[in-house]
Swiss-Prot record:
Its EC number is 2.7.9.2. It comes from the Archaea. Mg(2+) binds at residues 699, 723. The N-terminal domain contains the ATP/Pi binding site, the central domain the pyrophosphate/phosphate carrier histidine, and the C-terminal domain the pyruvate binding site. It comes from Staphylothermus marinus (strain ATCC 43588 / DSM 3639 / JCM 9404 / F1). Homooligomer. Forms a large complex of about 2000 kDa. One of its GO terms (molecular function) is metal ion binding. Keywords: ATP-binding, Kinase, Magnesium, Metal-binding, Nucleotide-binding, Transferase. The N-terminus is blocked. The lineage of its organism: Archaea, Thermoproteota, Thermoprotei, Desulfurococcales, Desulfurococcaceae. This is Probable phosphoenolpyruvate synthase. The gene is ppsA. Catalyzes the phosphorylation of pyruvate to phosphoenolpyruvate.
Length: 834
């Protein structure tokens, strides 16, 4: 190592660098050095220091030319900005590098080759910028300076180091610094020179979900070849979501990857290859592709093996642990090296979006609803879907633009929706004007996604065909939280949100004041709801979802007609649309919290009360245990009406993009009826899955006895304590006499024993258990029993949400203390020799 103080050296090895050297080597290099010291597999290399760059511009006199010129211009004048920055970059490239700096770069390149055991002229390296302000927590500056891959030979390395220095003065970099309030004089440039990984697969990963901010997962994006295709948003990459605790893959999306960037050893350069669907082969503009590694690529094949996904997740957690912060990481898998040594980390930076985001959502701006084509959510046509890259709602006139320097780009107005194939840093001035952004290509960590989140602009990426489907000049609404673009201005989504106070149970405080007051509980606290409009009053209460959404109110108040009557009149759409509108109102207001919608549970006498109902409903002596629940859905006479309910659910989930809606079957008596009802759902296109849960009400004693059998058909149960008490005790819930005598009591030992049986049997099969009857809202002692029995969630009336959450937290603490005391007693006995 050199005797010259580190801060005065032109070059330092990466393994000499620590996080304290950010000023000298920039954020990227400092992070690489930190990871090497932490034992993370990082390709070897060296850093051309910021001091070398500073020495260059001072010794050559460029400093006195560059900064006065830059500080004299208006960066919002794009023409002047482009001309000025181009002139500065040319000055840098035309000015010879001081010999003492150039020779150091050549020397270290030769030494790197020697360390690796390669001939210098054959050593391929990545030459990357590492600006001293680039990785500040306040701004990610995604793609601000240049990166050059597969560079080889001393002359080329020297040339591309200068190119990196010059990239400090692109229009986009200058614009960003001004926008972030960073003085140009304080922005210096270090350069990474690092051995290239022969990338079979490359990509990015986050140690939290980049869209939702979920801290319990690692999100990995991958595609074939070099990572430039992923980072640059040129391809929609494969995606894996990995649970941090178990390292199990909890979600996986394999996309059609038709583009890759690879190094062609015969041509000695990187080439962009595309999948030819007709030839079923990879081709480039220069003809057929004859690269050994590419033979293993296929557009629909996962770009990573499961073992590689888990290895990457392990490394992500090590890096996160080392820094104590959420991280944004670039990685590559080497084609020539066997697993697990083939996985390398090539960059890591602090995650910048969720790190600085407060509770406010910039994306959801308060604005008057303006537009010619104003529609309701239930009537809105879905134009395209994509990956929800930046949350929020944006609505306005769409403009399809393919070139950020085109006439169309110059005419782009503030408040319009930008629709394009993909973005790179040249698009930033346009992006800042946009009310929302939609791209054909890219993943959640593409340039469009990163910058949109940083700017607080709703964005959807990877739609595939937005530029073809969306026409310039039409009004659209972009839902960046769900990845859906609607035609028209959807008033339900864009209307101003007023401050809503939680005036429940005597609580009259704002959501901001309320949030810190409630404790976190292991047992989920859900809320029961019947009237959709009431969600505006209650949505800011501390509940984890809607555990029971009754649709009977929507049918009686919004639809009013018997569904079979509407079918006979040819007005099925009225029923579907109204039901969908009511459900969507609730699901939209609390997204992404789940909404468990119970299919209709009218009794025959209640159905007769609907307009036109008398024709279709028999008169029963005991409707409470008569033709209700699932028995109606599978009956040939009523099945068409049940199908309307299923279609409404499907519309909410698939057309409106509200995938937080689940369903629940009421009054389930047998497994065979449940099986038949599920089959009808499947025929209508709704099938149980990872993101679509199906529950059953547990209110008939047959479920108590056979919960483990019923669990084969559903994901969870919700105990209806009212009907369950009635049927276990044989006590009519509507009988005042029996109630006064104390017969109808959910706390009866027989009822509690039945509830405990349901929980135990359901859990033995992996099903969850909730309760949505009135008991928890009325009897605190039942809540304690339920928590101790291991129930997964408790759904209560709005006025009981806060009290129940606090009660559950207290009970959970008491249970933990009991267990701790037992452990301590055992330890004490062991120490005393008992």
């Amino acid at each position: 190592m050199s005797n010259v103080p580190k801060e005065k050296r032109f070059i330092v090895w990466l393994d000499e660098v620590t996080k304290d050297d950010v000023v000298l080597v920039g954020g990227k290099n400092a992070n690489l050095g930190e990871m090497i010291r932490a034992g993370i597999p990082v390709p070897p290399g060296f850093a051309v220091t910021a001091y070398a760059y500073k020495y260059f511009i001072e010794k050559t006199g460029l400093k006195d030319k560059i900064y006065p010129l830059l500080n004299s211009i208006d960066v919002n004048d794009k023409k002047v900005l482009d001309e000025t920055t181009a002139k500065i970059r040319q000055w840098i490239m035309d000015t010879p590098m001081p010999p003492e700096v150039e020779e150091e770069i050549r020397k270290y390149y030769r030494e790197l080759a020697k360390k690796i055991g390669m001939e210098p002229e054959k050593l391929r390296v990545a030459v990357r910028s590492s600006a001293t302000a680039e990785d500040m927590p306040e701004a990610s500056f995604a793609g601000q300076q240049d990166t050059y891959l597969n560079v080889y030979g001393e002359d080329n390395v020297v040339y591309y180091v200068k190119r990196c220095w010059a990239s400090l003065f692109t229009s986009r970099a200058v614009f960003y610094r001004v926008a972030q309030g960073i003085p140009h004089e304080k922005s210096l440039m270090s350069v990474t020179v690092q051995k290239m990984v022969n990338s079979r697969t490359a990509g990015v990963m986050f140690t939290l979900h980049p869209v939702t901010g979920d801290e319990k997962v690692v999100v990995i994006e991958a595609s074939w070849g070099l990572g430039e295709s992923v980072v640059g948003g040129k391809v929609t990459p494969d995606e894996w979501v990995v649970d941090k605790q178990t390292l199990q893959i909890v979600d996986q999306k394999i996309h059609h990857k038709t583009l890759a960037i690879v190094f062609d050893p015969k041509k000695g350069k990187n080439v962009e290859i595309r999948w030819d669907e007709n030839k079923q082969a990879w081709v480039s503009e220069e003809g057929p592709v004859d690269i050994e590694m590419v033979k293993h690529f296929h557009p629909d094949k996962p770009a990573l093996k499961e073992e590689e996904v888990k290895r990457l997740a392990e490394l992500a957690l090590l890096i996160e642990k080392h820094y104590g912060r959420h991280m944004d990481i670039e990685w590559a898998v080497d084609y020539d090296i066997p697993f697990p040594d083939n996985v390398f980390i090539v960059q890591a930076r602090l995650e910048t979006v969720w790190s600085v985001r407060k509770e406010k959502e910039k994306a959801e701006k308060k604005a008057e609803i303006k537009g010619k084509n104003i529609v309701k959510l239930s009537e809105a046509k879905v134009l395209v879907r994509g990956l929800p890259a930046s949350p929020g709602i944006g609505a306005g006139v769409a403009k399809v633009i393919f070139d950020p320097h085109s006439k169309e780009a110059q005419e782009f107005k503030e408040g319009e929706v930008l629709v394009t194939k993909m973005t790179d840093p040249d698009w930033v001035p346009l992006m800042k004007k946009a009310v929302a952004i939609v791209t054909d290509e890219g993943g959640m960590t593409s340039h469009a996604a990163i910058v949109s989140r940083e700017l607080g602009i709703p964005a959807i990426v990877g739609t595939g065909n937005a530029t073809q489907v969306i026409k310039s000049g039409i009004e659209v609404t972009v839902d960046g939280s769900r990845g859906v673009v609607y035609e028209g201005i959807v008033e339900d989504l864009v209307k101003p949100k007023e401050e809503v106070k939680a005036e429940v149970a005597g609580v009259g405080i704002s959501p901001e004041q309320l949030l810190p007051l409630y404790p976190v509980t292991a047992t989920k606290i859900y809320m029961n709801l019947g009237e959709p409009d009431a969600i505006e009053k209650y949505k800011d209460l501390p509940f984890d979802g809607i555990g029971l959404m009754r649709i009977e109110f929507i049918i009686t108040d919004w639809v009013q007609y018997h569904p079979l009557y509407l079918i006979e009149q040819g007005k099925e759409s009225l029923f579907i649309d109204k039901l969908a509108e009511g459900i969507a109102k609730v699901a939209q207001a609390i997204y992404p919290r789940p909404v468990v919608v119970r299919f209709s549970d009218f009794k025959t006498n209640e159905y007769r009360g609907l307009k036109g109902g008398e024709k279709y409903e028999p008169e029963e002596r005991n409707p409470m245990i008569g033709w209700r629940g699932v028995s109606r859905y599978i009956h040939p006479k009523y099945e068409p009406a049940f199908r309307l309910e299923v279609r409404a659910i499907k519309k909410v989930r698939e057309e409106m993009g509200l995938t937080n809606v689940w369903v629940m079957f009421p009054f389930v008596r047998t497994t065979w009826e449940l099986e038949r009802a599920l089959k009808i759902m499947e025929e209508e296109g709704l099938k149980r899955g990872k993101d679509f849960k199906v529950w059953a009400m547990a209110e008939v004693p047959s479920i108590v006895l056979l919960a483990d059998k019923f669990a084969e058909y559903v994901d969870g149960f919700s105990i209806g304590s009212n009907d369950l008490t009635q049927l276990i005790l044989g006590a009519d819930r509507d009988s005042n006499i029996l109630a006064e005598m104390g017969y109808f009591d959910e706390r009866d030992p027989a009822v509690l024993a039945g509830i405990k049986m349901i929980i135990e049997k359901a859990h033995s099969k992996g099903a969850t258990v909730s309760i949505c009857g009135q008991a928890p809202s009325v009897y605190p002692e039942i809540v304690e029993f339920l928590v101790e029995a291991g129930i997964d969630s408790i759904s209560v009336n709005p006025d009981a949400v806060i009290a129940t959450r606090r009660l559950v937290a207290s009970i959970e603490r008491k249970i933990m203390l009991k267990r701790l005391n037992k452990i301590m007693d055992k330890l004490n006995k062991l120490e005393l020799g008992f």
